[in-house]
A protein has these predicted regions:
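Juxtamembrane cytosolic amphipathic helices that cap and anchor the N-termini
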Residues: 180-191
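Hydrophobic core of transmembrane alpha-helices in multi-pass small-molecule transporters
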Residues: 70-88
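Residue-level signature of mid-helix packing/kink "hotspots" within the transmembrane helices
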Residues: 26-34, 121-122
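Conserved MFS/SLC helix-loop-helix module at the cytosolic interface between two early adjacent transmembrane helices
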Residues: 31-71
Length: 191
């Protein structure tokens, strides 16, 4: 939402178009999260995160370079960035951390990742607001691109362990079977 005024003034993006793009972004984030989770389970967390970072980076890049009005704004801001969020938000990194640490230290490791992620969520709007005021929306998006490229490079070095630290028996359950089981569980539905 911090970009709205700049997008409205520079690109003539209406609040309806901006709101719709954010709605598409949130929808794509929610829809692709389980898909990236399945990719992480099957091929490794690094593949899921790298794939998501590519979508996120391409979305920001095209938003930065244009064309970024009309349907292009919806594709870049809504679709691509939303898909990227599905695999780069906290859920996939948490699953990777969970697989890397034994039960005895898993809780502290996951707590550290959560704390760092939360601190990032705290700092991000402060930094974004400062950058927008000092440098404008275009340069702020360029800075975001640099952060994303750094994350993409770092994700390349993330490797899933060959064997999870806590899993003794690996389930042969398919993605469809897992979804069916989840939607039959009252706690999952309430969540």
């Amino acid at each position: 939402g911090l970009f709205f005024i700049d997008f409205n003034e520079s690109l003539n993006i209406s609040n309806t178009a901006f709101g719709f793009a954010i709605g598409v972004q949130m929808l794509m984030w929610g829809l692709t999260g389980p898909i990236f989770g399945a990719i992480a389970d099957r091929y490794g967390g690094h593949i899921a995160i790298i794939s998501a970072f590519i979508f996120y980076t391409v979305g920001i890049y095209f938003l930065y370079t244009g064309p970024n009005t009309g349907i292009f704004f919806q594709i870049h801001m809504g679709l691509l960035i939303g898909i990227g969020l599905g695999g780069t938000a906290i859920s996939i990194p948490m699953s990777i951390v969970g697989k890397h640490f034994p039960l005895s230290t898993r809780t502290i490791a996951m707590s550290i990742v959560t704390a760092i992620g939360s601190f990032g969520y705290f700092l991000s709007p402060i930094f974004t607001n400062y950058s927008l005021k000092e440098y404008g929306w275009n340069y702020t998006l360029f800075i975001f691109l640099l952060f994303l490229i750094t994350g993409l490079l770092a994700a390349y070095f993330v490797r899933s362990p060959s064997k999870s630290e806590s899993v003794e028996k690996v389930s042969d359950q398919s993605f469809k079977e897992a979804l069916t089981e989840a939607f039959k569980t009252k706690s999952y539905i309430l969540l």
